[in-house]
Amino acid sequence: MKNILTEREQNVLFYVSQGLINSEIAEKLHISVHTVKAHLESIYYKFKVANRVQAAMKAIALGIIDLKAIA
């Protein structure tokens, strides 16, 4: 299931899991806040979830995000 996400979507999810807000993620990735929101919407659709917390939890459960990398 990891391959279902683009590299950029994985980057966005990593920063979501670290607790960053959209504007902080945009700054880190050198993209617009609108683009961050678009990536999140795509992630929600692919994961069949409703919000960023559910998306991060699913990514951790699927091994897309390593908890050790967050700490």
Language model features: what each stretch is:
Residues 1-14, 68:
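Regulatory hinge/linker segments at domain boundaries
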Residues 6, 32, 63-66:
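Serine/threonine-rich low-complexity intrinsically disordered regions
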Residues 17-20, 62:
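Short helix-capping/turn signature of helix-turn-helix
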